Amino acid sequence: MTPTYAPSLLDKLLGDADEAQRGVLARYSIERIKASVARDIEHLLNTHASFTPEELAAYPHAARSLATLGLVDISSLSMASDRDRKTISDSIRHALMRQDARLREVEVAVREDRSATAKLSFSIRAKLMLHPHTEPVAFDAVLHPGSQRYEVGAA
């Protein structure tokens, strides 16, 4: 029998109305869980933090609040600079480690993109914590510099 898992809180809140009306307890396949995580990562990366945790260091509760949800502003960084690309990938990794408790051992790397389009691609690898198991996951993230928007999908 293929294992199934309980959906995340967000999936429960946004869940299937038909299942809720029938009183069905939703169980997701690993593929559906991974798709849900990809969606959540995309939402997180497209959210801009009001403050960095460092700016709120004197206020530890605020530093762990929604005020720091998302990524810091990267609009002043150059996509052509290796140092700035590392800064962006580090920012993604820190945001995922700090703000998604389901993910452990998060690694983010810039991928070389040979296409003619102006975009920056990342590879995200982590371990997804699914009680009582862990599942290795991999996602591709693409930053479109003009809009500063990310797209995330399964690798």
Q: Which residues fall in each region the model found?
A:
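Beta-rich nucleic-acid/ligand-interaction surfaces
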Residues: 111-122
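Acidic, low-complexity glycine/serine/threonine-rich segments
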Residues: 68-98, 102-112
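Hydrophobic residues positioned within well-ordered beta-strands of beta-sheet architectures
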Residues: 106, 122-124, 137-139
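Charged, glycine-enriched surface loops/patches
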Residues: 120-132
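Immediate N-terminus of the mature polypeptide
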Residues: 1-80, 129-155
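A cross-taxa feature marking solvent-exposed loop/turn segments within ectodomains of secreted
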Residues: 101, 117, 132-134
